[in-house]
From Swiss-Prot:
MF-aspect GO terms: translation release factor activity, codon specific
Protein name per Swiss-Prot or TrEMBL: Peptide chain release factor 2
Family the UniProt entry places it in: Belongs to the prokaryotic/mitochondrial release factor family.
Flavoprotein among keywords: no
Function according to Swiss-Prot or TrEMBL: Peptide chain release factor 2 directs the termination of translation in response to the peptide chain termination codons UGA and UAA.
Disulfide bond annotation, renumbered to this chain: none
Keyword Protein biosynthesis carried by entry: yes
Keywords assigned by UniProt, alphabetized: Cytoplasm, Methylation, Protein biosynthesis
Species, as recorded: Chlamydia abortus (strain DSM 27085 / S26/3)
Xref: InterPro entries: PCRF, Pep_chain_release_fac_I, Pep_chain_release_fac_I_sf, PrfB
UniProt cross-references to PROSITE patterns, sorted A to Z: RF_PROK_I (PS00745)
Modification(s) after translation: Methylated by PrmC. Methylation increases the termination efficiency of RF2.
A Pfam family: RF-1
Amino acid sequence: MHESLDKRLEGLLTGLALAGRSLDLEGKRQELSILEEQTLKEDFWQDVTSAGKVSERIVSLKRQIAHYEEFKVRVENLAFFLNDGDVSADPELREDLEKEFTICEHILSEWETQRLLSGEVDKNPCFLTINAGAGGTESCDWVEMLFRMYCRWAAQHQWKVEVIDRQEGDVAGIKHVTVKFSGDYAYGYAKAERGVHRLVRISPFDSNAKRHTSFASVDVYPEIDDEIEIDIRPNDLRIDTFRSSGAGGQHVNVTDSAVRITHIPTGIMVSCQRERSQIQNRESCMKMLRARMYQQILQERLEKQLLDRKNKKEIAWGSQIRNYVFQPYTLVKDVRTGHETGNVQAMMDGELLDDFVKAYLAEYGEIS
């Protein structure tokens, strides 16, 4: 009997049809055709920035269409083997089908999550910043651990990872780091991580092996294009230059190429030392500044939506959102959703972070 597999196949077929409509495949194919025609024009590469964005969009569209087509073939193959194969008499076939069903159901779950990401900038690349809280070396080490977790998580999503700014700790770890994630729905997923992350563990830096509590704050803001107008007056900016910090090398600490820009009315400060030239670092800083200011607009909208709701949900971006306990027991628990896991190693390897993000989106996706 394979009645349970029949029901799972029915669920996949229904999900396939819904995914096809929600992904607007026909619209994506038309957009792809138009963009590919643009690349054939002689003056396409005259505006390198614009051409780069078009090329990135083409890659994204091709990936989304191919992903759907591959999924469709997998579901059709499942239907074929389920209808034509003798599943009940072939345990090995059933085991293979079970594995394939699990993979397809996971893919479908990813698409269902993306349906919650309907915000105007959810599809955009994003900047993620981690800052050490009080606690000195402990907190700096915690920042480095979180940085590693997010980079591994981004790799699983096949996002491009660029370190924009990084300040090493005095003894170990990282005081501050800003990284850019570029890929499909990077901001939509990463926005769930905004807030304070708390670590409880026996410190490797304490010879008395006492338990320590460390804090790190995470901020996430979307990269926005020039079509979104953000009013930034030159007179409101303070621009400082300084020497890049790092492990050394020919281009480190030689010239004042790193740039820090402060928006005086809001106090927002951004810095970049990734590029070798001051001009390039300044351009990167302005992108981050526009993104941070746009994030403020989004936050104000969110607060208004929360006030308008009868059943107000508490979201405070500056508040503690997740606890990571390594000793005396192992537990990672999200304060907002209650989602938890005891497998802290898999969590810190980025393997379970999606589960926490999905729980957040299921709870708050409609208003975030």
